[in-house]
From Swiss-Prot:
This is Heme-based aerotactic transducer HemAT. Heme-containing signal transducer responsible for aerotaxis, the migratory response toward or away from oxygen. Belongs to the methyl-accepting chemotaxis (MCP) protein family. The gene is hemAT. Homotetramer. GO terms for molecular function: heme binding; metal ion binding; oxygen binding. Disulfide bonds: none annotated. The keyword Membrane does not apply. GO terms for biological process: aerotaxis; chemotaxis; signal transduction. Keywords: Heme, Iron, Metal-binding, Transducer. It comes from Bacillus subtilis (strain 168).
Length: 432
């Protein structure tokens, strides 16, 4: 026991005075319920007077009361954690001292009630549970009873002190617990309102999400359909690339055949050009021969003329020789005519040779140009074939990628459908 009993004094502890007739309950109408609570616990002016008479005794032992109160809190570590998180033991001891002294002031007014409401609000805010609050208040009551037993020898007055103290502590607990409940109800109402708002938001959002997923599902399905179309087009493109590649290879082979033919023509033209050069040389030699023959004919004609002259001089004896000379002259003239005709033909032949040579040169140039163009076309076909191979490979890769993409889209479509079904279920739940 914290307090020693003093049995020496047997006189009355509470003096009779008009103080107990004082109007000690000074509450306005806003605390009408508190007035009813006071009546229920039988806490009136007489009891408040007793408390006022006990105040010096409480003040004398206030340190021991407060120390015992906080020592008792060691039984629950969470209480000390709350104290250390929001204040300190020393500060709270001073606060508790003032609070206890106010309980024994002998007056209950609006300020008294408001302070208790504020205390309850603080307790709720820092997370103090009602069970720990009530347990701690029981320690206060027991400490005060020990003080009374040690100081008040008159059993009736001791009982009066215990009753008054029990009633004021009971009122304290009622006020704090009511404030607890009020704060709790307010918090619960706020949470309920938030829950309703959240419920409404979830319902609205769920509906929006449901619509969104429905649209997404349609979009994904459209994308799947389009992807399938692209896949078919890609396959068709691969087939087309293969066909173009085959035709390009065939065209390249035909071009190579034509190029070989052009090479043969070019070789033949070169040979013809060489033969034409030889023919021109032969024609030039023939012209030289014609010159010689013409000279011989002219010499023969001159000899024939000389023979005719000599025959005329010879008279009758030279007639036979004149006939021969005349025939030789005719033969010479015929030879000259023939040579002239043949020379003209040779000249015409030379002209034709020159024309043909020019044509051959032109053809040769055309053949060279054609060969060059065929070479370029051949390179172009090589590039086309190479490009078609790359295109076919890329088309095949694209088709593989499209198939994988299509598979992924189908997975997404199934996932979207599953989520959409879940959202629909959520919408139904929120509507309930």
């Amino acid at each position: 026991m914290l307090f020693k009993k003093d049995r020496k004094q047997e006189t009355a502890y509470f003096s009779d005075s008009n103080g107990q007739q004082k109007n000690r309950i000074q509450l306005t109408n806003k605390h009408a319920d508190v007035k009813k609570q006071l009546k229920m616990v039988r806490l009136g002016d007489a009891e408040l007077y007793v408390l006022e008479q006990l105040q010096p005794l409480i003040q004398e032992n206030i340190v021991n009361i407060v120390d015992a109160f906080y020592k008792n809190l060691d039984h629950e570590s969470s209480l000390m954690d709350i104290i250390n998180d929001h204040s300190s033991v020393d500060r709270l001891k001073q606060t508790l001292k003032r609070h206890i002294q106010e309980m024994f002031a002998g007056v209950i007014d609006d300020e008294f009630i408001e302070k208790r409401n504020r205390i309850a609000s603080i307790h709720l805010r820092i997370g103090l549970l009602p069970k720990w609050y009530m347990g701690a208040f029981q320690e206060l009551l027991l400490s005060m009873i020990d003080i009374y037993e040690a100081s008040i020898t008159n059993q009736q007055e001791l009982l009066k002190a215990i009753k008054a103290t029990t009633k004021i502590l009971n009122l304290e607990q009622q006020l704090v617990l009511e404030a607890f409940q009020s704060e709790y109800n307010q918090t619960r109402d706020e949470q309920e309102e938030k829950k309703n708002l959240l419920h409404q938001k979830i319902q609205e959002t769920s509906g929006s999400i449901a619509n969104l997923f429905s649209e997404t599902s349609r979009s994904v399905q459209e994308l799947v359909d389009k992807s399938e179309g692209i896949s078919q087009a890609s396959k068709a493109g691969t087939v087309t690339s293969s066909t173009v590649e085959e035709k390009s290879i065939g065209g390249k082979k035909e071009l190579e055949v034509q190029q070989k033919q052009m090479n043969k023509i070019d070789t033949s033209l070169v040979q013809i050009e060489k033969e034409m050069v030889k023919l021109d040389e032969i024609a030039q030699q023939i012209e030289k021969i014609f010159g010689i023959v013409t000279g011989i004919a002219e010499q023969t004609n001159l000899l024939s003329l000389n023979a005719s002259i000599e025959s005329a001089r010879a008279g009758e004896h030279g007639k036979g020789f004149a006939v021969v000379a005349n025939e030789v002259r005719k033969l010479s003239e015929d030879t000259k005519k023939t040579v002239s005709t043949v020379s003209e033909l040779v000249n015409n032949t030379n002209t034709q040779i020159n024309i043909v040579s020019k044509h051959i040169k032109d053809v040769n140039e055309l053949v060279s140009e054609s060969k060059e163009k065929m070479t370029q076309i051949n390179r172009l076909f090589d590039e086309i074939v190479h490009s078609m191979k790359i295109s076919k490979e890329q088309s095949g890769k694209i088709d593989v990628d499209l198939q994988a993409f299509l598979g992924g889209l189908q997975e997404v479509s199934r996932a979207v459908s599953h989520v959409a079904a879940s959202v629909d279920s959520l919408v139904i739940l929120t509507e309930e």
